[in-house]
């Protein structure tokens, strides 16, 4: 069935086009469109991501070189002008692509669900990455007086090892403000760094029946209500505490748990706050250690997909490009899982980047390609994921 299909077309066949079209209709994305549809736009942007195009002009040159293959790649019959793609990114509702990104994240999370920790319930890490922008080119993204930037806030499923939710803001907004956009699930665990010490939001997590683990700031004001006397190795404190600061006490009126842990590998001490009384102190520390997976995700995203350089200057264009990067990431994760590939996903992407216009079956491509010299640079795409 895939004998005469290009590799890129085989890859994008894993996506649910019907679902994407539902979002297009919802936001009237193809209104007044004659040739270059929203689906064509998505595939064109994904082709640019997977083939490592540096700019919009670079992407258009690539399509000009493959003019005869355009229709079968899924980007339409008509030649794509730079102004056509730029206008689509500028004017078409970014929510079409963001909603589809959420759909792809949900599908990837459900398919790749595993249990890397012996703790019942979903486990998420929430963090952000800042992408610097030129203020004169992106005036809407003002960060500091002479600097611009955007933040991508990501809720990362640490067991499926794909994002479960994300939101985009200007870099000037404090990290903790993004916590209000999360729909917390009962009995799930949410891991935060100390930038997310909003006691109002932490109390909302508690009232939802969810659990949090957050690293405490050094200026935390509290009183000890009860503490454990016998503790395992490297656990310095395991106590029930209550906030004493006037404002913080009003935001979080109940007691919670404070755990101080000494990490021998890093030779440093960590203090965690949590409402998960059912966990041991060592499980709390182990849960927080998994937060590094979201940092690896950000590093991988910036290194292998195009979000450091944007192909449009409007907020809408930036949001579309970030959404397409997330969609591409999830697609590769789904293909990697569905095909039970034994290669690292870095190898998969390297093979794809030079094979998108070949007519080799995906299975043959990944089984037969000699890629023994390719090493993962610093980390796998899905570190520790077992297939």
What is each stretch, according to the model?
Residues 1-58, 62, 92, 99-103, ...:
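Single, function-defining residue in the core of a domain
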Residues 52-55, 67-72, 87, 133-134:
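Short active-site-adjacent helix-start/loop capping segments
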Residues 64-71, 75, 178-179:
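Glycine-rich loop/turn
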Residues 69, 95-96, 107:
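Short helix C-cap/helix-to-loop transition motifs enriched in small/turn-promoting residues
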Residues 72-92:
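Major-groove recognition helix of helix-turn-helix-like DNA-binding domains
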Residues 73, 112-113, 141-143, 201:
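Catalytic micro-motifs at enzyme active sites that drive phosphoryl/nucleotidyl and oxygen chemistry
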Residues 106-113, 175-176:
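A short, well-structured juxtamembrane/interface segment
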């Amino acid at each position: 069935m895939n004998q005469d299909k290009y590799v890129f077309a085989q890859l994008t066949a894993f996506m649910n086009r019907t679902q994407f079209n539902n979002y297009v209709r919802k936001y009237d994305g193809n209104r007044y469109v004659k040739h270059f549809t929203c689906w064509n736009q998505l595939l064109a942007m994904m082709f640019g991501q997977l083939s490592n195009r540096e700019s919009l002009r670079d992407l258009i040159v690539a399509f000009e070189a493959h003019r005869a293959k355009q229709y079968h790649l899924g980007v339409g019959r008509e030649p794509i002008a730079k102004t056509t793609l730029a206008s689509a990114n500028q004017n078409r509702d970014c929510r079409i692509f963001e909603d589809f990104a959420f759909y792809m994240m949900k599908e990837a999370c459900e398919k790749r669900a595993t249990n890397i920790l012996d703790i019942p319930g979903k486990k998420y890490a929430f963090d952000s990455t800042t992408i610097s922008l030129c203020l004169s080119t992106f005036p809407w993204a003002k960060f500091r007086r002479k600097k611009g930037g955007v933040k991508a806030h990501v809720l990362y499923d640490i067991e499926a090892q794909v994002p479960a939710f994300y939101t985009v803001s200007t870099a000037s907004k404090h990290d903790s403000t993004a916590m209000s956009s999360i729909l917390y699930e009962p009995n799930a665990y949410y891991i935060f760094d100390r930038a997310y010490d909003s006691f109002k939001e932490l109390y909302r997590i508690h009232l939802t029946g969810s659990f949090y683990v957050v690293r405490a700031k050094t200026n935390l004001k509290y009183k000890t209500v009860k503490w454990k006397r016998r503790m395992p190795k490297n656990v310095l404190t395991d106590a029930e505490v209550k906030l004493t600061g006037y404002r913080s006490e009003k935001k979080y009126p109940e007691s919670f748990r404070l755990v101080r842990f000494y990490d021998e590998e890093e030779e440093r001490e960590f203090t965690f706050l949590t409402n998960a009384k059912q966990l041991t102190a060592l499980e709390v520390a182990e849960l927080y250690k998994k937060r590094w997976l979201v940092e690896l995700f950000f590093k991988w995203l910036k290194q292998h997909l195009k979000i450091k350089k944007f192909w449009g200057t409007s907020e809408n264009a930036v949001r579309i490009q970030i959404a397409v990067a997330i969609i591409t990431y999830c697609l590769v994760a789904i293909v990697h899982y569905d095909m039970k590939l034994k290669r690292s996903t870095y190898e998969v992407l390297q093979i794809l980047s030079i094979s998108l216009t070949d007519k080799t079956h995906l299975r043959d491509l990944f089984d037969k390609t000699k890629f023994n010299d390719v090493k993962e640079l610093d980390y796998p795409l899905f570190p520790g994921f077992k297939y």
